[in-house]
Structure formats: C-alpha cells, structure tokens
Amino acid sequence: MDNNEKEKSKSELLVVTGLSGAGKSLVIQCLEDMGYFCVDNLPPVLLPKFVELMEQGNPSLRKVAIAIDLRGKELFNSLVAVVDKVKSESDVIIDVMFLEASTEKLISRYKETRRAHPLMEQGKRSLINAINDEREHLSQIRSIANFVIDTTKLSPKELKERIRRYYEDEEFETFTINVTSFGFKHGIQMDADLVFDVRFLPNPYYVVDLRPLTGLDKDVYNYVMKWKETEIFFEKLTDLLDFMIPGYKKEGKSQLVIAIGCTGGQHRSVALAERLGNYLNEVFEYNVYVHHRDAHIESGEKK
C-alpha cells in the first residue's frame, strides 16, 4: 500500500466549533446527510477516548464530525491541548472547522429565534457581552482551525453548499482555494486570508450603459480588462500567488480565501475574481471556487 492509499484508509475526525449562532447545528446536519457519524456537544476531555474507538476500525466511525461549544466553559479551555495531543499521538486525521459571524448578525439571529445565548447566565448578562466574551474565549481554538468560515452573509443553502464542496468528493485534492469578490461599502470579507483592493482601477460604474450590469457581463469584463493598469496588476497578482500558494499548502493549510474588493462589489472585483479563478484552475490542481458576495446587492438581482 503506497502513502496515498494509507492516507485514504485512515479515519477522519472533524471538530466543528465556533461562535454560538454561527451555524454549527446546520453544519452538523449537513455532514450527517453526507454520511458522517455526528456527535453534538462532546466534552473535550472525552475526545481522546472517542479517537480510541475510531482507531479500533469500526466502519461506522471512519468519518466522524463532533460539535463542541462553550457551554461547559471550564471543559472547553482544554480543547486546544486535547486536539494537539490527538494530532501528535493518533493515526486519525483530525481537522478543526471554526464558524463565526459578525456581532450584529449574531444578535439578529438570536432575536429571530428568541433563544438565549449560552453565556447569558439566565439573563444576568447582556447578549452583546455574552457574544464578546465567547469570541475572546474561542480565539485560541480559532487560531489552529483548518477551516474558518464567516457565515455573516451566507444563507443556510449557501453554507450547506460550501460544506459539501469541502467534504463530499473524496477524490478531490484536499487543498481548496476560494476566490471571493466583495464591496468595501458592505464590509470587508472577514474570513479572507488575502485581501486585494482594486478600487484604483477605472470604474465601469461611471459608464451609464454598464452601471446596472456586473463583472459577469461581457461588456463590463472587457471594460475592466482593457486598461494597462489592470494588466500590470493582474500580472503582479498572479506572480505573487504563484509564489505564495505552494507555501500555504506546504505549511498544512487546508483552504485559502482570496478576497478581491472594489467599492460596491459589482464590477471590478467581480471581473477580476472571475479571471483569477480561471487562472488558478489552469495553473494549480487544487479545488478552486469563485463566489461573488455583493454583486446581487448592487445590481438589484435576486440572490
């Protein structure tokens, strides 16, 4: 058995954690539908024992997802140490997925569901203080996560689609590159590893016929690409990424989020994200996905 076959034969454990209200339950449901054995709210101290069960070769435990949250704050404090211990001592492949969202979005979700945040201590603390406290306590586990997903602007359907892309096809290369366009006026892409600001390029918004269109339309795309500044920028951008991406892969990173921003996220960033996605698909044998976060907002199209 070669090394690749050995890797494929190993059991896989995905720890799903993150901010309360960011989508952990939805992710666990999605993974369960995809054939994962799922466990909700396992105390971190029991993680090594669970891994021992997985090492016994039970076929039903070959792909496992465990949701762990901050409800048992004292127990949660040991999670980073437990994960590091399992990674160093076990043959089980362990990844950590961290889900987050903006404070404003989390407050909105709690108001919609009328549920209490687990750290509100039966109403003794405000919701915003509970969220901020949780964010601070989770900063360490976030720093070791293989996947960080910001669900602020993701619908439940979009979150499920992203999870399926990452985990559904075992034959795919495990390293994933997500290229996202966004508009600075709608907020920066919070889960981005690399952010590139293209607001210095000529803006199609000021061409009346192009204003209602997006960078997905041929006329807008051609307008953005016809400028010398665009060609110079794209050449420098791809030269930089050609150098950086193999380094990220070598260091064990599972995903890379590249965000390209313009003013509204409708024209320049969309066109360049499309071009960059095509380039990366041609140059690298990795999973490359392109997403346009804000194009529908400015153009008035339905999402």
UniProtKB/Swiss-Prot annotation:
NCBIfam families, A to Z: PRK05416.1 (NF003828)
UniProt xrefs under SUPFAM superfamilies: P-loop containing nucleoside triphosphate hydrolases
Molecular-function annotations in GO: ATP binding; GTP binding; molecular adaptor activity
Pfam families, sorted: PapZ_C, RapZ-like_N
Protein family membership: Belongs to the RapZ-like family.
Superkingdom classification of source: Bacteria
Binding-site positions, ATP: 18-25
UniProt lineage: Bacteria, Bacillati, Bacillota, Bacilli, Bacillales
Organism: Staphylococcus aureus (strain NCTC 8325 / PS 47)
Family matches, as InterPro entries: P-loop_NTPase (IPR027417), RapZ-like (IPR005337), RapZ-like_N (IPR053930), RapZ_C (IPR053931)
Protein name: Nucleotide-binding protein SAOUHSC_00787
Function text: Displays ATPase and GTPase activities.
Residues involved in GTP binding: 69-72
Keywords: ATP-binding, GTP-binding, Nucleotide-binding
